[in-house]
Every structure is written in structure tokens, then in C-alpha cells.
UniProtKB/Swiss-Prot annotation:
It comes from Erythranthe guttata. One of its GO terms (cellular component) is plasma membrane. This is Casparian strip membrane protein 1. It comes from the Eukaryota. Keywords: Cell membrane, Cell wall biogenesis/degradation, Membrane, Transmembrane, Transmembrane helix. It holds the Pfam family CASP_dom.
């Protein structure tokens, strides 16, 4: 009885066949975990920025409202008068203070209306459209606020110190309460300016992370 011997012949793979095959499991590149970690950290960072934005926005609205109410209710009448004159000072005697009240009312209204958009940024931290709208409107608000605060600060300075070259007398020695209230309103408006600038910087920082 003959025994058949099986001969095994090993055929080497060609380079073309070896290129078409890839291992099923292999270690990911070193940069993949870092990229995934950055993608996970971005929403958390933006949500933190949005929460801080909301706090600053409410604080700025409070400062702007305080400036508006303080200036809008500023009036003082001196206890003495003559037969023809009564010595009285009111914010609407000066167009600059009237502009201040109108401008700060607009800024206050905008800041209150922008709070829902800030809440949307907390709920959807990766959304760029609400953040872009806020940074544009915040820039307009800080411009209006700065113009009103700067113009009123010049009038308050003249009320305290006068101008000898123009023969403008200081009135704060007589109208002390009037000057204190207008000065407080101007200080509150500059606080709102600083907070609005921080809001613009925060929005720009959040957009940069996109």
C-alpha cells in the first residue's frame, strides 16, 4: 500500500497584497486622545464663560438702572428765594444730563432684553449666532454709554470747579445735593461701561474658542 506524501509549499505574499491588509486593532495616534479631550473641554469652558457673562450682564443692568434713576430724579430747590426768582436746579435744565438719562435708559433696556440670549448661551454653549449678536450689540451699548458718561462727567466737573476763563461759577457750594446725585449717577454709568467692556471681551474669547 503506497503512502502519498503531501507537500506543503509556502507562497510569500506580494507587496501589493500586504498593502491591502490592515490589522483590525491598533493603537490610535498620540494626537487623537488630546483632540478628543479638547473637544470635551470646549463646551465646559464656554458654559463657564456664559454663566460669568450672565452675572456681569445683570450687574451692568443694575449699574445702568441706578445711574438712570439717580440722574432722572435729581432736583434741588434752595430754601431762599426773591420776589422774582426761585433758585432751583434740575437735571433737565442741562441738555447733556437729559441726553444722559435717555442714553442710559436705552442701555438699561438693552441689557435687560439681552439676558434671555445670555441664558441661551448657557444652554447651548457651542452656538455661535447668539454670542455674535451679543458682541455686536454690546459694542454699540458701550459706545452709547461711554458718550453719555463722558459728556456728563465734563458738566459735573464744571459744576464742581467752574471755569474762570469763561466766567462760569461753580454751583456745588449752593446746590450740594444736586452735585452729589449727579456725580453718583456718572460714577454708576462708568461702572456700567467697565462691565460692558468685560462683556465684549468675554464674548470675543468665547467666539475665539470655536
Amino acid at each position: 500500500m503506497e503512502k502519498s506524501e503531501a507537500t506543503t509549499i509556502d507562497v510569500a505574499e506580494t507587496s501589493r497584497e500586504s498593502k491591502g491588509k490592515a490589522p483590525l486593532l491598533r493603537d490610535p495616534p498620540a494626537w487623537v486622545p488630546a483632540a478628543v479631550e479638547r473637544q470635551r473641554a470646549a463646551p465646559a469652558y464656554k458654559r463657564g464663560v456664559a454663566i460669568f457673562d450672565l452675572i456681569l450682564r445683570i450687574s451692568a443692568a443694575t449699574a445702568a438702572l441706578a445711574a438712570t434713576i439717580t440722574m432722572g430724579t435729581t432736583e434741588q430747590t434752595l430754601p431762599f428765594f426773591t420776589q422774582f426768582f426761585q433758585f432751583q436746579a434740575s437735571y433737565d435744565d442741562l441738555p447733556t444730563f437729559t441726553f444722559f438719562v435717555i442714553a442710559m435708559s436705552i442701555v438699561t433696556g438693552y441689557l435687560v432684553l439681552s439676558v434671555p440670549f445670555s441664558i441661551v448661551c448657557i444652554a447651548r454653549p457651542v452656538a455661535a449666532a447668539p454670542r455674535l449678536l451679543l458682541i455686536l450689540c454690546d459694542t454699540l451699548a458701550v459706545t452709547l454709554n461711554t458718550s453719555a458718561a463722558g459728556a456728563s462727567a465734563a458738566i459735573v466737573y464744571l459744576a464742581h470747579n467752574g471755569n474762570s476763563d469763561a466766567n462760569w461759577l461753580a454751583i456745588c457750594q449752593q446746590f450740594n445735593d444736586f452735585c452729589q446725585r449727579t456725580s453718583g449717577a456718572v460714577v454708576a454709568s462708568f461702572v456700567a461701561v467697565v462691565l460692558l467692556i468685560f462683556l465684549v471681551v468675554l464674548s470675543a474669547s468665547a467666539l475665539k474658542k470655536h
